[in-house]
Amino acid sequence: QYGCTLNMSIRSLQQGEVNFTVTGDTYVVDNTTLHPGDQVTVFYDGNAPAPLIYPPQYKAVVIALSAYHQYYLGEFYNNFVSTDGTLQLNGMAAQGTFLPNGQIFSGALVGKTALVEYTSSTRSIPAQTTPDRVIVFCYS
């Protein structure tokens, strides 16, 4: 469908140049319009098929402007430690916990994919942070 996708090329500090396909299914935090030169964090499904080409090309799942915030996308155990053991949430999000459509989320994070927005974290393992905002994706 012509016009329904956006091809985006970014220069990553870790991976060099990377191409992303942005579709109507891509969640863009705060529905922000992206511009050339924006500092972004892009999450993609590492288990999804991808062509073996250079530069690598992935389908973007979540995109966030990241000039002032850091982001983590993943699942959490009931002790608020991420399932990969890299991040621990201390306390509730300052701005709240929401669904992608902006409605308040009142359930438990366990077993759900969550996008955590934060400004600082400790250098411990796992890193600890008090999130600014949490967006919970309830997949069926």
Each language-model region and where it sits:
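Short, flexible, surface-exposed loop segments at domain boundaries
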Residues: 1-9, 29-89, 101-140
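Short, basic/aromatic beta-hairpin or loop at an interaction surface
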Residues: 9-22, 84-95
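A cross-kingdom feature marking solvent-exposed beta-strand/loop segments within repeated
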Residues: 16-32, 95-103
